[in-house]
Structures are given as structure tokens and as C-alpha cells.
Amino acid sequence: MAKNKKKSIIKKPNPLLFFLCYILIAPILKLKYKTSYDKSGLEDLSGPALILCPHVSNIDFLLVALTLAPNRPTFVVSEHFMARPPVRWFLNKMHVISKKMFCPDIKTIMNILRARDSGNIVVLFPEGRLTCIGHSLSVTE
């Protein structure tokens, strides 16, 4: 029974790794892209929560993570990122939820529900790919 209980918990990202990424990446984005973050409406954000974002650039996950800090969100990412050993190590430490692209994936849904039950803030980019128009694509049946 205890083994089942432990398996059902989706941990939040590693706090030390998240903090190190924050202090290294935030200044770079500020200098290179002149980023600023509007956190209005996020002051009292706590889990469980599901955040849906349009995927318009390759640094979307960084911008979302920095905006949600000090909360440590759990991201849903494509499983093809897990094929590269250094990236896999990092993503495993960040406790991401992997997803098969462009097909129904019940394991991902179950892991999102486990993350919700664990009180996590889950971030999902529903398009599963970059959009070229800067806003969400229509949802297909």
C-alpha cells in the first residue's frame, strides 16, 4: 500500500536546481530580450492549478517558470526530449511529465491528475508545437 501511495506522488521540481536556473537565466533574459513580468493575478497562486499557455517561442517554458517563481511549476514536455541523456537528467530532476506527441496518452493524463493531487502547478502548452501566429491554435476534434 505504501509503495502505491509513493508512486502516486508527482514531486515539484528540485528546489536547488530551480533556484540555480532562476539566478542564472533571469539576468540573461533581462539583458538579451529586455524581459519583464506582469505577475498581477498571480500573487496568491498556489497549487493545485493547471496553466495553459500558447507556445510561441523556444523559451516559453523559461518565461513561464520565471513568471511563476517562487512557485516551482511542473511542466508537461514531449518525450523526445527524454532521449538525450544530459537533457533527460535535467528534466528528471525537474520532475516533468513526459507526453507522446500528437496522440492520446492516458499515462500523461494520469500523471497530470497525480500532480494535481500532489498540489502542483502544472503547465501545459496545448498546441504541442510552436505557433507561427503568436496566439493559440484552434482545438481539433
Identify the function of each model-found stretch.
Residues M1-A2, V96:
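Soluble, non-transmembrane catalytic domains of enzymes that act on hydrophobic metabolites at membranes
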Residues K5-L24:
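Helix-enriched interaction subdomains in cytosolic or periplasmic regions
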Residues L31-E141:
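Soluble catalytic domains of membrane acyltransferases
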